[in-house]
Amino acid sequence: MAHHKSAIKRIKQNAKKNARNRHISSTLKTYIKRVREAVEAKDKEAATVALKAAIPVIDKTATKGVIHSSNASRTVSRLTKLVNTLG
């Protein structure tokens, strides 16, 4: 256990950040999963709706620094490409 006051504070801050980041990451994965499931079911309408819901979540996750902005762009691009294959 840390002895310095600043180290104790850092441990608390890191625990808070970790919990917040885990929640955001989990939410992000759920939205991505919904898009992929709709595509697997070959439901163009549901996939489009799921994608429109997922894009702001992906962008917000990148803005908060949980994922890198390039990762967010790549994910959006791949999901959009996937939905567009349904024609």
UniProtKB/Swiss-Prot annotation:
Q: Name one GO biological process term.
A: translation
Q: Which InterPro entries match?
A: Ribosomal_bS20, Ribosomal_bS20_sf
* Entry GO CC: cytosol; small ribosomal subunit
Question: Annotated region Disordered: where?
Answer: 1-22
Query: Which terms are listed as keywords in the entry?
Result: Ribonucleoprotein, Ribosomal protein, RNA-binding, rRNA-binding
Recall the GO molecular function terms of this protein's record: small ribosomal subunit rRNA binding; structural constituent of ribosome
One Pfam family assigned to this protein is Ribosomal_S20p
NCBIfam families tied to this protein: S20
Q: Which family does it belong to?
A: Belongs to the bacterial ribosomal protein bS20 family.
**What is the name of this protein?**
Small ribosomal subunit protein bS20
Source organism (scientific name):
Pelobacter propionicus (strain DSM 2379 / NBRC 103807 / OttBd1)
